[in-house]
Amino acid sequence: MFKKTILSFVISAVMVTAASAVENEQPKSNQFWWPNQLDLTPLRNHSDESNPQNSNFDYAEAFEKLDLEAVKKDIDKVLTNSQDWWPADYGHYGPFFIRMAWHAAGTYRTHDGRGGAGGGQQRFDPLNSWPDNVNLDKARRLLWPIKQKYGQSISWADLIALTGNVALESMGFKTYGYAGGREDDWEPDLVYWGPESKFLTDERRDKKGKLKGPLAAVEMGLIYVNPVGPHGNPDPLLAANDIRMSFGRMAMNDEEIVALIAGGHTFGKAHGAKKPTECVGPEPAAAAVEEQGFGWKNRCGTGSGADTTSSGLEGAWTITPTQWTTNYLDNLFTFNWVKTKSPAGAIQWIPDTDTAANLVPDAHDPTKRHAPIMFTTDIAIKEDPKFRAIAESFRKSPDKYELAFAKAWFKLNHRDLGPRSRYLGNEVPKEVLVWQDPIPELNHPVVNDADIAKLKSEILKSGLSVQDLVLTAWASASSYRGTDMRGGANGARINLSPQNEWQVNNPKQLAKVLNKLEKIKDKFNKKSKKAKISLADLIVLGGAAAIEKSVKEAGFNNKVPFTPGRMDASQAMTDVASFGVLESTADGFRNYYSDESNLSPAQMLIDKADLLTLTVPEMTALVGGMRALSANADGSNHGVFTDQPGVLSNDFFVNLLDMSVKWSKKPKSEALYEGYDRKTGKLKWTATPVDLVFGSNTELRAISEFYASKNAEEQFITDFIAAWHKVMVNDRFDIK
């Protein structure tokens, strides 16, 4: 025994030493040595090199050929085919799959559009190993035979969302609809999920308890809120505040919140048969290689079935956990609820009467019965006056409740899919919903080359400057977010509230520009017998005309691509509050930065470039071009390193790298810098941190040097136009 102990100790010591050696021999990033260095990694994510599919693979085309009904039938078979390695509660995987789909979509947040069902990110670290996603690794493995069968014709992202719908339908619920179109990612998203370094901790609130920055979940590793209550405090009213804040930051109003919680908790059960600290192993990301991606191995009892331990809460909410009913609401309002503890020690709630002790069937043993349970977050629905009123109205009107849940579920799973033009399949609802940011369908012939040339001439003769036209086109198109495909030039919402009031868009000057463009549009459309042009198209065309003028003045003849076909949205089609989150608190391309920004100016530039799906060279070319065109939001000369503003040249890079200029911070200013002639001491330029980072950051300086070379001016113009066009058509899913 003594020898075995010694041997075990030696082996353990060797393993620890080996692990430490391997860790020490791993390459270290620049951020390891210099944590404050600007990180360009977000602009390199999701490279084509990560994607194993052929470059000519068209997912939309493959999906449209798919027999969706056959896929649904295959999913339906899986639902009631319980597997020994992970037995189904109540003989039905439906509730399990609903949780999987919900948690895949539920990471979405409105403030930056990140998270959500798109990409199938639940397959990757860190999401697949979040505490709130405990045991969902098994749900995806149950679906693997279906994914394997249909291959690339249906993405994991679409399959997960579809499975949630099929699960609901199999349990008697009528869903609102389904759309495919979510292409899979092949690597994890790089997302700021919070400042914490440990799961289930909360360092993300201000002094008033509000979440900071773009965050929506209340703790690291949770999808929404702590079901026990804020920081484990089982106070229903405090929980209601967290629920409203968290779900609200995920685009849900009070009615949708109540419908989702009540509807979701109509099905299935929570799992807390054992104490996690005593029974449950590490999450998938930390599990041994032989586990093959499985995590949370349970060493107590059978490890699954009746011994399953997930959240630590235990029990079902309703008497029929695999059927759609109003029983959740009936139980919530019929009983008085008192606190108790699950077998795992988590605080939950049960009725205060013994008459409820045997209402709920056991998930695996037909001879056992239980009392229904509620989380603190369920009791919050009853205790919060506004939530309660909605829940009571649902209880009185089951049809209203069912439709509300159906619509909220559809919104949850489709919020990050983008405009309806991206929706695929034959189950897309006909109703157009305002949260889909609707734009009228094209209903007229578009302008031809001759019309375009004439309109360009009219625009340039209107008295609008290059700066006016470039800034307006940029303001319109750069509202786009590649995270959830919202915003962009299509719809001309730059002409509507709230975008026409945003400080970054210089509202007074914007109104003057749009007024002149409106007149040009109306004049053309009145005279034209067939072709029409929208304001959305004319704004983009104005930017193209201005850039071509600036290119010509630089001595080149490059043309800016333009594809008509945009339409104009109305104010009625625009949810002002919903669009409010698209407002830029910083836009380094226009040298704009406000105190409301949660990152430094340079970091905000990277974030903006990431939202616009730009690469590092594209971002660099655009910043250099915008400075040459003197396109600062406030009309200032910061970063306009040229003697010929308005001419598209590489002067920004040439003068930034000029060694005859010495830079220093402007006295009494943390946000501005001054560039002086080293010999004369004369002030030559002023700059922001965004301008100077292209000379201080080694990677950005390398690209700046490329564009500053004597033979690179035409290449710079070509690259600027290509990057500009990319931004202008980011939202043109009709031509992609």
UniProtKB/Swiss-Prot annotation:
There is a cross-link at W102-Y224 (Tryptophyl-tyrosyl-methioninium (Trp-Tyr) (with M-250)). CDD domains: catalase_peroxidase_2. There is a cross-link at Y224-M250 (Tryptophyl-tyrosyl-methioninium (Tyr-Met) (with W-102)). Formation of the three residue Trp-Tyr-Met cross-link is important for the catalase, but not the peroxidase activity of the enzyme. Residues 1-21 form the signal peptide. The active site is at H103. GO terms for cellular component: cytosol. It is an enzyme of class 1 (oxidoreductase). Its cofactor is heme b. One of its GO terms (molecular function) is heme binding. Binds 1 heme b (iron(II)-protoporphyrin IX) group per dimer. PANTHER family: CATALASE-PEROXIDASE, HYDROPEROXIDASE I, BIFUNCTIONAL CATALASE-PEROXIDASE. Bifunctional enzyme with both catalase and broad-spectrum peroxidase activity. Homodimer or homotetramer. This is Catalase-peroxidase.
